[in-house]
Amino acid sequence: LYVFHATTHVSLRQAIDDVNPKRMDDILQLVHAFSKALNRQDEPIAVSGLNPHAGENNIFGTEDSAILTPAIERAKAAGINAVGPIPADALWPQAVRGKWKFLVACYHDQGHAPFKAVYGDDGVNITVGLPVVRVSVDHGTAFDIAGQNIAREESLILAAERAASLSLGWSSVWEAASKSEGV
């Protein structure tokens, strides 16, 4: 399962402001480029709604219908298999059961919290949009346990293995990323 964040380490207020048409177009292009590097470009990219119930016909906000739906339609017109917006509380159970391999979360905790709840420390942070493969462990720096001989190396090994597996197809990801202004 690959989870992409339209916004990352910003406040929720800032994330809502940052979810805009250009950002959504760019993230969908980057996810598509990444899926092509994995030779899985035909798999759908599931986009999570920003608001509860993906806005529920604009009852809970207009961002889903005004920003996300048009971005998904533009992606489809460009040949990208994007679907949504799907309410996050529906999207995640479907993803865990295998329906989706590529997800776009609108903000950090919408993507990170459920991923960590299901997969724990078995995640790898992949930075898409750079000319080189850049990965890191998904759990942070762990400064609180540094020097205590209790850190586990499994996450680092997983990150290194993922970097090696991605390196061969990375040029296609970078080519697509360099055409956008980034996210």
Predicted segments, located by residue:
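Anion-binding alpha/beta catalytic cores of soluble intermediary-metabolism enzymes, centered on
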Residues: 1-63, 69-183
